[in-house]
Each structure stands twice: as structure tokens, then as C-alpha cells.
A protein has these predicted regions:
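Structured-RNA-binding interfaces characteristic of tRNA pseudouridine synthases
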Residues: 1-250
Length: 250
């Protein structure tokens, strides 16, 4: 049977989601945990490959298991007892055998948290920017993202992908809980895309470029023309949407 896990994790202590040689990953930790609890070798497939230090307040993964998990609350309790403090299983659902946590997603939402005041307790959870920036200009620039689909300029160099096209459905800055938060939703994202977009918008907010600079960057299709990649600790995956009737439990 195939199961869908809903979980969250603080990425500060991990080299991203995906298993890597000689590095600790979120995927590796969860697979070891589930294999012990279910007494069977378990492999999980995540909804995406978050980079080192990136967090997820909402993340999904699927795995196959030969038996029916009858008591799901007990499974969740045991899983969280085994897992470290910075990874939490939230829910478990039965799904169709052809469900895929990564390729089945219709959209994803990321948030990037930025604070303009120094707080040592936020060092691993947001980006502290010392300079004054104009968030109004940054919001105007962000609106331009809706006009394009090819975002090669924001993709990590030498990315091995079939297409650089993404359909952005939301992109805006808001002030929440003493943070400036950039929220962006799209049908798919390129590697390093969100952090590069945020870095480019910050340079516009700092006055280094005019708002229309974003048009030139996107049309150039060159990573060198875009802004810097902001630090990983401010980035969160916050939502994933799947087609209706994905869950067999419903």
C-alpha cells in the first residue's frame, strides 16, 4: 500500500531533504525511523529537494508498505518519539498506488523571512538585513513576475532540467509578526529560484536598480544578470497542493 506523510522540519542541521553521501539529510533520518517502526526496509519520496538549511513548515512524502497501518495515531506517536526534535510527522493518509509526492503536486508555496532588526534568536530562521530597503518598490517589481514563464535567469547554473518554464500565481511582500515575508506560489520551481528572486528584489529595494530592471534580468536568461542568492535559513516551504480525491481516506 502507498501512504502519504505530512511533516515539517527545521533544516538548520541538515544538508537538505535528499540523501547525500557523507551528509545528514532529512530523508535519511525519516527512512531509518520508519524502517525501525514498521520492521521493513522503507524508502520515501519527497515532494521536492530542499537545499541545505532550508526549512519546511509543510512537506509531503510518500512510501510503500506491505501491510495496512491500522492505528495511524499510534504510528504518528511512535514516529515522533524516534525522530529528533527538529523533524515532526503531522499526519498519515492512504493514497492511490500511482500517487507521487513530487510529480503529482499541482503547486507549491514558499515563504522567505527577512528581518531588519538584529535578533540572535532568529539567526537560523530568518535573514537579517542591515540596510534600509523600499518594500513598496520590491512589491511593484514582484508584480512583473506574473508576465513571464521562462525563469532561467533565476535557476542555479548548469541545472539539468527539461524546461525553465514556471507559472507563478502569487508573489508579494507582506509584514507578518515582525518579519517581512515574501510569499511565492507556482506550479513548479527551479533549483535556487526563490532565493535568487528575493536577492534580485532586495537589490531593487536598496536602490541599486530601478523596478524595470527585473524585466531586463528575466529577458536576459542569464544567472549573472540576476541578484545574489539570499541565505538558506530564511526560506520555508509552506504549502503543497495535490489534486482532489488524492486521499483514499476521504
Amino acid at each position: 500500500m502507498r501512504y502519504l506523510l505530512e511533516l515539517s522540519f527545521n533544516g538548520a542541521n541538515y544538508h537538505g531533504w535528499q540523501i547525500q553521501p557523507k551528509s545528514v539529510s532529512v530523508q535519511e533520518i525519516i527512512e531509518k525511523c520508519l524502517s525501525i517502526i514498521l520492521n521493513e526496509k522503507i524508502s520515501i519520496v519527497g515532494a521536492g529537494r530542499t537545499d541545505s538549511g532550508v526549512h519546511a513548515s509543510y512537506f509531503c512524502a510518500h512510501f510503500d508498505y506491505s501491510n495496512l497501518i491500522v492505528n495511524k495515531l499510534d504510528f504518528i506517536y511512535k514516529s515522533n518519539s524516534f525522530l529528533p526534535f527538529d523533524i515532526s510527522i503531522k499526519n498519515l493518509f492512504e493514497v492511490k498506488d500511482d500517487f507521487h509526492a513530487r510529480f503529482g503536486a499541482l503547486s507549491r508555496t514558499y515563504q522567505y523571512k527577512l528581518n531588519t532588526f538584529k535578533d540572535p534568536f532568529l539567526a537560523n530562521s530568518s535573514y537579517y538585513l542591515k540596510k534600509d530597503i523600499d518594500f513598496y518598490k520590491m512589491n511593484l517589481a514582484a508584480l512583473k513576475l506574473y508576465n513571464y514563464q521562462d525563469f532561467k535567469c533565476f535557476s542555479k547554473s548548469n541545472s539539468d532540467v527539461n524546461t525553465f518554464n514556471c507559472i507563478i500565481t502569487n508573489a508579494s511582500w507582506t509584514f507578518k509578526e515582525n518579519h517581512w515575508v515574501f510569499e511565492i506560489s507556482a506550479n513548479r520551481f527551479l533549483r535556487n529560484m526563490v532565493r535568487a528572486i528575493v536577492g534580485t528584489l532586495i537589490e531593487i529595494g536598496e536602490g541599486k536598480h530601478k523596478i524595470n530592471h527585473l524585466d531586463s534580468v528575466i529577458k536576459s536568461k542569464s544567472r549573472e544578470e540576476a541578484g545574489y542568492s539570499v541565505p538558506a535559513q530564511g526560506l520555508y516551504l509552506t504549502n503543497i497542493i495535490y489534486p482532489k480525491n488524492t486521499l483514499l481516506d476521504e
